[in-house]
């Protein structure tokens, strides 16, 4: 069976006309632009959900990746760089996976997600997108 489950069918009444980014066990239910997709859970999808829940907020990659320096661990600057790389790679991988299924959603995410030392979801205020989680 294909690891990425793509479902194009009539949407359940509960999500019709809505945008959904919701974890359901080992999968994520993603609905955007009338298309329903179920993707296996990944760290990148978790990071994206975290950002989508905080539109307009800059989230430090260290917080997003859960990288907290520990005594005897790498210096804070090294931990911050590792977190930045981990967050960026994970988010890009998740976006690539989404892009193979839903062109309108990946176009939206490419225009609104930034990664780096700080990561953010910054939707255009003139084109609001509401999400259910």
What do these predicted regions represent?
Residues 1-133:
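Intrinsically disordered, low-complexity protein-interaction/activation regions
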């Amino acid at each position: 069976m294909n690891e990425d489950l793509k479902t194009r069918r009539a949407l359940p009444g509960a999500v019709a006309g809505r945008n959904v980014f919701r974890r359901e066990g080992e999968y994520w239910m993603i609905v955007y632009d009338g298309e329903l997709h179920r993707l296996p859970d990944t760290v990148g999808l978790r990071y994206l959900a975290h950002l989508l829940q905080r539109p307009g907020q800059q989230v430090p990659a260290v917080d997003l990746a859960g990288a907290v320096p520990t005594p005897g661990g790498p210096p804070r600057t090294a931990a911050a760089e590792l977190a930045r790389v981990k967050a960026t790679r994970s988010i890009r991988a998740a976006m690539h996976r989404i892009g193979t299924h839903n062109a309108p959603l990946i176009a939206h995410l490419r225009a609104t997600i930034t990664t780096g030392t700080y990561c953010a979801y910054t939707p255009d205020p003139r084109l609001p997108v509401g999400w259910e989680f």
